[in-house]
Curated annotation (Swiss-Prot):
Stored HAMAP family: SecE
Major site of localization recorded for this protein: membrane
GO terms under biological process: intracellular protein transmembrane transport; protein secretion; protein targeting; protein transport by the Sec complex
Keyword match Transport: yes
Record note on quaternary structure: Component of the Sec protein translocase complex. Heterotrimer consisting of SecY, SecE and SecG subunits. The heterotrimers can form oligomers, although 1 heterotrimer is thought to be able to translocate proteins. Interacts with the ribosome. Interacts with SecDF, and other proteins may be involved. Interacts with SecA.
Biological role: Essential subunit of the Sec protein translocation channel SecYEG. Clamps together the 2 halves of SecY. May contact the channel plug during translocation.
Spans through the membrane: 17-37, 41-61, 95-115
Protein name per its UniProtKB record: Protein translocase subunit SecE
Membrane topology: Multi-pass membrane protein
InterPro entries xref list: SecE_bac (IPR005807), SecE_sf (IPR038379), Translocase_SecE/Sec61-g (IPR001901)
Family (UniProt): Belongs to the SecE/SEC61-gamma family.
Any GO CC annotation of this UniProt entry: plasma membrane
Length: 127
C-alpha cells in the first residue's frame, strides 16, 4: 500500500514540474510583451514564439497534453471519413432551403394580413 502510494506520487512530481514550467513560459511571454514594448516588434515576436513553442513542446510530454494530441489526431481521422457533399448538391440544397423559406414567409404574411383585417373588421363594428 505504502509503496503504491509512493510510486503514484513519484509520477505526479514530474507532471507538476512540467505544468509549472508551462505556466512560467506563458507568464514570461506575457511579461516580455508588456515590459519590452519599446524593442522591435520582430524581436518580441521571435522571443514570444520561442517561449510558446517551448510551452507547447513541454505540454505534449504531459499526460493531458498526450490526451489532447490523441484527441486531435482522432478528430482528424474522423474528418477524413466524412463524405462531403459536392458543389452541385450543396447548390440544390441551398436553393431548396431558400425557396421553402420564401414560401413559408409568404404563407405567414398572408395569414397575418387576414388576421389583421379580421381584427380591424371586428373592431370597426362597435356595438
Amino acid at each position: 500500500m505504502n509503496k503504491h502510494h509512493y510510486n503514484r506520487n513519484k509520477h505526479k512530481i514530474p507532471e507538476k514540474v512540467k505544468w509549472i514550467s508551462i505556466s512560467i513560459f506563458f507568464i514570461l511571454s506575457f511579461f516580455i510583451n508588456m515590459c519590452f514594448y519599446e524593442t522591435q516588434l520582430f524581436i518580441r515576436i521571435f522571443i514570444i514564439s520561442c517561449l510558446m513553442l517551448c510551452a507547447i513542446g513541454t505540454m505534449i510530454y504531459t499526460k493531458k497534453g498526450k490526451d489532447i494530441l490523441l484527441y486531435i489526431v482522432m478528430s482528424k481521422k474522423e474528418m477524413q471519413k466524412i463524405i462531403w457533399p459536392k458543389y452541385k448538391e450543396t447548390l440544390y440544397t441551398t436553393f431548396i432551403v431558400i425557396s421553402v423559406t420564401i414560401f413559408i414567409s409568404f404563407i405567414l404574411w398572408s395569414i397575418d394580413s387576414v388576421i389583421f383585417r379580421l381584427i380591424a373588421f371586428i373592431i370597426s363594428l362597435r356595438f
